[in-house]
């Protein structure tokens, strides 16, 4: 980054604060909490405890403050997903791209959620996680398996990531920052 660009970014940060609220959803063991930790600290741990209910964490990237709702993915918590997805800047749906056995359930849960009228038009970011594992789907295969091309009522974006290796995490953060709302 050049000196002039750095100065302009600093100047902008004095006058413009950006905020966004996100809901991270997906089936259990997809890597939602790992994603929160990688975005917040850059750290990854193999020993994750399943999220019971939800966790909230605020992360600041540059002049953007991101409020992350990390929602449990077990069947008993899925009914509360809609409540935490209303009025967010974007819905982030995490999929274990190396677990083909759960893709049909994951697709069904996603499409059921997005059919709720309270969520109309909210941008969707689908993250195929665990691409470091053998047999992980490609972006094209995940897009097809999840029926993402049929979602025409909102912006839909898909990235393939690895929380373990931090693969494409910068792209995810860039997408999130671009979808934040200015608060001056």
Swiss-Prot record:
Record-level GO cellular component terms: cytoplasm; Golgi apparatus; late endosome membrane; lysosomal membrane; nucleus; plant-type vacuole; plasma membrane; plasmodesma
UniProt superkingdom: Eukaryota
Start-end of intramembrane regions: 1-18
Gene3D superfamilies: P-loop containing nucleotide triphosphate hydrolases (3.40.50.300)
Keyword field: Cell cycle, Cell division, Chromosome partition, Cytoplasm, Cytoskeleton, Endosome, GTP-binding, Lysosome, Membrane, Mitosis, Nucleotide-binding
Pfam family, one: Arf
Single Gene Ontology MF annotation: GTP binding
Residues that coordinate or bind GTP: 29-34, 48-51, 70-74, 129-132
BP GO terms, sorted: cell division; chromosome segregation; defense response to virus; protein transport
Subcellular location: Late endosome membrane; Lysosome membrane; Cytoplasm, Cytoskeleton, Spindle
Record has Iron as a keyword: no
Observed effect of gene inactivation: In double and triple mutants arl8a-1 arl8b-1 and arl8a-1 arl8b-1 arl8c-1, impaired multiplication of tomato mosaic virus (ToMV) associated with reduced production of negative-strand RNA.
Function noted in UniProt: May play a role in lysosome motility. May play a role in chromosome segregation. (Microbial infection) Component of tomato mosaic virus (ToMV) RNA replication complexes. Required for tobamovirus multiplication, especially for efficient negative-strand RNA synthesis and viral RNA capping.
Subunit record text: Interacts with tubulin.
Entry similarity comment: Belongs to the small GTPase superfamily. Arf family.
This protein's name: ADP-ribosylation factor-like protein 8a
